[in-house]
Amino acid sequence: MIEPQMSVVVPVYSVEKEYFEECILSLKQQTLEAIEIIIVADGVKKEILDLCKSFEGQDERIRVVEQENQGVAVARNNGILNAKAPYITFVDADDWVEPEFCAFFYDNLKIIQMCRLYLRQHI
């Protein structure tokens, strides 16, 4: 596995299966391949946990972190604690992102080396 340059934390609790599948597919198709996808299963139902583990088995960049239901803030923090890359971003489990999502942030963060936080809203 390539050393990840960006960790993408995806907290999961209650999500429609189709939206979640689209989310993970969009992350797997990133133009920046040196990413890790950390799915934080926050007390999810068995069906969703099985889906999480299925994704983990399909792609070595995906890791599943299980926790009892503690809410999205704790799930994000748990994702941060498990991140291996120097940069971290978050994606909600019912969202999808464009293929350049990670590359855009990574390229801009590399340019602005002193940057510790970079926010961008795009709808």
What is each residue range found by the language model?
Residues 1-123:
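Nucleotide-sugar donor-binding/catalytic module of glycosyltransferases
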